[in-house]
Design a protein with these regions (language model features):
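SAM cofactor-binding core of SAM-dependent methyltransferases
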Residues: 554-589
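Structural motif corresponding to the intra-repeat A-B loop/turn of tetratricopeptide repeats
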Residues: 366, 403-404, 438, 491, ...
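"A position-specific structural signal for the A-helix of alpha-solenoid helical repeats
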Residues: 358, 395, 430, 483, ...
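Beta-propeller domains
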Residues: 2-330, 428
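Short coil turns that delineate tetratricopeptide repeat
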Residues: 350-351, 384-387, 422, 456, ...
Length: 589
């Protein structure tokens, strides 16, 4: 089986590019894009989900708290909510422009099931109209799924039709629209069933039902649109294995095939099962073919969207339409002029931990945190370097922290790193910061102290290096000292906290600018206690004795600011003194 047709394409003149959602809400998953060309414009629709898919692959050493495969939803909203974004794609540069969320507000109703929105939309051009068609499951209390067709204009849904069928079934999904035959879909592949939707009644009726001589090991389920190629109809289907672990946690493996039909809808050729980029979960919703090549859009682990350009000869070879020999898949290097995106070096060697890590860094810097998490987790599962595995696991937790609203998951993922190597301080700092954020100061203080015990175990090993240093944000043990001083203040240890901040400020530790300023601010804000008050015993200490100074028996200003004003005004009387931001009139005024 070819586990990496993207590599096949790259080694034979193809290219791949990420489809980046510019304004990705919270950095959660983007997936399952579709593609269509109408006149001189090529459109792409990208599915955006509010979850991040966590999938521990390979040896599955690092499960989430809910198993090896799970949707990490906001913990205050477990619905699987989808929104769709429409943009225009330049097929030469892969530049994605004019990307906006499709406005569906005209037809939306309050969802009554947990799968919300139109899922896995395929783009369609029927009669020069831009349409999307996917499954919606939020209109019934039991999640009944039906395909829908929506017309889109200027990023707004202007019509929505729900397709009914003659038989009462629970879930209809992944129908493949036939692009040159309006309102027709391939509903099943073996046997091949084609339905046609009456646009007046929105009822789909079977118009073709053909047994096939080919026998596949798994059901062929819908994927891309069905498009014309030479004298054939072609589409990319998906198939899946589903199982449960010994702990009764679900897992799955997705595969794809190219299916080729003749004009009478006989399957005359097909590819072997394949994967796009060697992940267990991938999904294809888009196929466009023109003179410049074959364009396939697909999702990676529900967290990232991609477009693959494949030369015609590669497509024909995979589909069984040609026996032309292709370049060797065992190559692991590209020439510099062959590298067009940060994905290329990964695609050439997808089980290289470092390459997974660097793709994760690229996605993180693009604020695509769910995608970054996928690659950091793969890096952790693949690496043989314990130091790096620890750091990759911290990066996984960091992605969930930045996405937000997943506190319980974040805690468990941090502990994945700590249990892997409990002798390193970085994880304890992140745990201390975690509990401080939750105002659990005693727990935060405890983890900071544990971290300090680990700081000298191995200074070389504990040195975070490379592009992820600023993400993990551990530049030295002084951050643990800071956490201890901060938590002591919130736990009522005022004098101790002041001393700890002061000791840290005057220490020889190499403080970063942000922490230097933060420590200085805390020293100023927390102030000395008892306060520096003035009383008549200090008269002789006044450098400038203003008029009437001898009348002052006591003044409660925190740091002599009242005395300063009188000094500057030479004891002026009968005026008004306004202090903005004052405290108690006698303590800490």
């Amino acid at each position: 089986m070819n586990r990496n047709i993207c590599k096949t394409a790259l080694l034979n003149g193809g290219s791949i590019s990420p489809l980046i959602l510019p304004d990705n809400p919270n950095g959660t998953g983007t997936c399952n894009p579709s593609i269509i060309k109408i006149k001189d414009k090529t459109y792409v629709v990208i599915r955006h989900v509010q979850y991040a898919l966590y999938h521990s692959e390979f040896d599955q050493n690092f499960h989430s708290p809910y198993g090896q495969l799970v949707y990490l939803n906001p913990e205050d909203d477990i619905s699987l909510t989808t929104n769709n974004y429409l943009g225009e794609l330049n097929l030469e540069t892969f530049e994605l422009t004019n990307v906006k969320r499709i406005d569906t507000s005209t037809f939306d109703k309050k969802p009554i099931w947990e799968f919300v929105g139109l899922e896995d939309a395929r783009l369609i051009n029927w009669n020069d109209n831009l349409l999307i068609s996917g499954v919606r499951r939020d209109t019934t209390e039991n999640g009944q799924g039906r395909m829908e067709i929506s017309s889109i204009k200027d990023h707004k849904e202007i019509s929505r039709d729900r397709i009914e069928i003659e038989k009462d079934t629970y879930c209809e999904k992944n129908w493949m629209p036939i692009l040159d035959r309006p309102y027709e879909y391939v509903k099943w592949c073996t046997p091949t069933e084609i339905v046609k939707v009456d646009p007046l009644t929105n009822v789909a009726k079977t118009i073709v039902l053909k047994d096939q001589k080919v026998d596949f090991s798994r059901d062929q389920r819908g994927g891309s649109q069905v498009v014309r190629y030479q004298d054939y109809w072609v589409a990319i289907t998906h198939e899946v294995d589903l199982w449960f672990s010994e702990q009764n946690n679900k897992d799955s493996e997705y595969y794809h095939r190219i299916i080729v039909w003749d004009n009478d809808w006989n399957i005359v050729s097909h590819s072997k099962e394949f994967k796009f980029m060697d992940a267990q979960i991938e999904f294809c919703c888009g196929l466009h073919i023109d003179d410049s090549g074959v364009y396939i859009t697909f999702g990676f682990q529900d967290n990232a969207a991609h477009v693959l350009k494949m030369p015609h000869n590669v497509f024909e070879n995979l589909a069984g339409l040609s026996n032309e020999e292709l370049n060797d898949l065992n190559l692991h290097l590209l020439n510099d002029n062959q590298i067009t995106s940060f994905l290329d070096t990964y695609v050439i060697d997808p089980r290289n931990a470092n390459r997974n890590f660097y793709v994760g860094i690229e996605y993180y810097n693009l604020k695509q945190y769910a995608a970054a998490m996928s690659y950091f987790l793969r890096a952790a599962e693949l690496s043989t370097d314990d130091k790096l595995i620890y750091e990759y696991l911290l990066l996984v937790a960091k992605c969930i922290q930045v996405i937000g609203k997943r506190d319980n998951t974040e805690l468990e993922l941090l502990n994945n790193a700590v249990r892997f190597d409990p002798k390193r301080p970085e994880g304890y700092l992140m745990l201390s910061l975690y509990y401080e954020r939750l105002r659990q100061y005693s727990t935060s203080l405890s983890y900071a102290k544990i971290g300090l015990l680990m700081k000298d175990n191995d200074l070389i090993r504990n040195s975070i290096y490379g592009d992820h240093k600023d993400i993990i944000d551990y530049q030295g043990s002084y951050k643990l000292d800071f956490q201890i001083a901060l938590c002591n203040w919130s736990l009522g240890q005022s004098d101790l906290s002041r001393k700890q901040f002061k000791d840290l400020f005057y220490s020889d530790k190499d403080l970063c600018v942000d922490y230097f300023n933060l420590i200085h601010k805390n020293i100023t804000d927390l102030s000395p206690f008892p306060y520096i008050n003035y009383d008549s015993n200090k008269q002789n200490d006044l450098i400038y004795k203003f008029k009437g100074y001898e009348k002052i028996n006591k003044n409660f200003s925190q740091c002599l600011q009242d005395i300063f004003v009188l000094t500057m005004l030479d004891g002026e009387t009968n005026g008004t003194y306004l202090e903005i931001g004052s405290s108690d009139p006698y303590i800490g005024n």
